[in-house]
Regions:
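N-terminal active-site segment of His-dependent metallophosphoesterases
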Residues: 40-160, 164
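Active-site neighborhood of divalent metal-dependent phosphoester bond hydrolases
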Residues: 111-112, 140-144, 151-241, 248
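Active-site neighborhood of phospho(di)ester-bond hydrolases with catalytic His/Asp-centered motifs
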Residues: 115-117, 144-149, 177-182, 242-243, ...
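Active-site environment of divalent metal-dependent phosphoester hydrolases
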Residues: 120-124, 153-156, 183-189, 235, ...
Length: 412
């Protein structure tokens, strides 16, 4: 076998801009390492977007106006879910009503599919993403939207983001798919109130604080109901795996090979909760900590297993990990490329480093390629205006810091 030295960084992206064929080592059904020929999906150039109508985007970021439509939105989505088969994007590909690891059998390459990662209450990033989608999509071929979950928690406008997604669903259910994130799955309603098994969980606190408000409570219950049956993974016909987190870790592979049960609760959980290690070859499965990670050989093993089971996977798009540039393509995963994309325009309170203003990303599906990353260069002053309170907490201005120091001296 010929050894291949794979480039890294920008050189890696340049080298992988066209698909290539490589001989790789991968395990066969018996676990024996054997050579395979793998065609590596290409990696399209990143697109920088700075020419949206930012004034129009700003006008759409109106939480009060979104709430005025809340009752109508909630009632319409409740009615849609009451029909048992709401007809969301890819629902027709489910093996049965309970299938949450959907094998998509056909996808028109000429009909655009946009993938939107973690939002965490970022109404500004959502409206910017929708503005780009609407601008770059022909009216004759409406865009399809795939959300990677995590709509709330970490401040921002969690309720309003959720309501806007509800609106998108009721307006055109066949063009919207929600892949559940860990914060979405963690939200539950017990009858006595809302709970969450994740931290931070400020959205469940918000819902409980507003239990006397009928429509906020019904919106929360509706979210729980929607997420309960929404997919955890999509297997696209070109080999792209779409998840929030990752894939079933290696300790589940033997049982999955024997059963073929993609909807095993442990598999569904791993699709949602696992994290990518950017450089490790392998990681021991560890679901008892936040760092339930996988490495690039773990993903290669999963790709081999999925092919055995009739669902070939060659590359993956995911959210979950809040990477520095809001997207990352990991050089270590060159044989089976992985894209992490996050749609955040501001630094979250739990993220201690870097500028407050971020560049959210979304991605456009392209057959036999990693989805193409689009970086939305939201004006910094707009981010600071919309999230003024969060910015004040993250970066108190110099005069306030000086005032605090003077006060400390006066009371010393």
């Amino acid at each position: 076998m010929t050894s291949i030295d794979l480039p890294s960084g920008a050189a890696y992206n340049d080298a992988m801009s066209e698909p290539g064929t490589y001989e790789m080592l991968s395990p066969d059904a018996a676990g024996t390492i054997a050579p395979d020929v793998v065609r590596v999906p290409r990696i399209p150039d990143v697109v920088d977007v700075d020419d949206l109508d930012w004034s129009a985007v700003r006008d759409l970021v109106d939480p009060a106006r979104v709430r005025t439509r809340m009752r109508t939105t909630v009632e319409r989505l409740e009615a849609l879910l009451d029909e048992q088969r709401p007809g969301l994007l890819f629902d027709e590909d489910r093996a049965d009503a309970n299938d949450r690891a959907i094998r998509v059998r056909d996808l028109d390459p000429d009909a655009p599919v946009w993938i939107i990662g973690d939002l965490h209450g970022d109404l500004l990033a959502l409206e910017a993403a929708l503005a780009l989608v609407h601008r770059d999509t022909a009216a004759s071929s409406p865009a399809r939207l795939v959300f990677l979950g995590d709509f709330f928690d970490d401040g921002g406008y969690g309720l309003e983001v959720l309501l806007r997604v509800f609106e998108l669903i009721v307006e055109a259910p066949a063009f919207v798919c929600i892949v559940v994130g860990n914060h979405d799955e963690a939200l539950q309603y017990t009858g006595a109130g809302f709970t969450a098994t994740v931290d931070p969980s400020d959205f469940s606190d918000f819902l409980n604080a507003h239990r006397v408000h009928e429509w906020i409570t019904r919106a929360g219950k509706l979210a729980v109901r929607l997420f309960a049956t929404a997919p955890r993974a999509l297997f696209l016909p070109d080999g792209l795996l779409v998840t929030h987190g990752g894939f079933p870790l290696t300790d589940l592979h033997a049982e999955l090979r024997a059963s073929g049960d993609w909807n095993d609760p442990r598999c569904l959980s791993d699709f949602t909760w696992t994290r990518a290690h950017p450089r490790a070859r392998k990681k021991l499965p560890n679901r008892t900590s936040r760092g339930s990670q996988f490495g690039y050989e773990d993903f290669a093993a999963f790709c081999a297993l999925s092919a055995e089971l009739g669902r070939p996977v060659t590359h993956m798009v995911r959210g979950h990990d809040h990477v520095d540039e809001q997207y990352e393509i990991y050089p270590a995963y060159a044989a089976h490329p992985v894209l992490t994309t996050v749609a955040l325009s501001r630094r979250l309170a739990r993220e201690p480093f870097g500028p407050f203003e971020r560049v959210p990303t979304i991605a456009r599906w392209a057959s036999a390629a990693l989805p193409q990353v689009h970086r939305l260069h939201v004006p910094a002053e707009l981010v600071r205006e919309i999230y003024a309170e969060e910015n004040d907490v993250a970066e108190p201005d110099a005069s306030r810091q000086a005032g605090g120091a003077e006060a400390d001296e006066a009371t010393a």
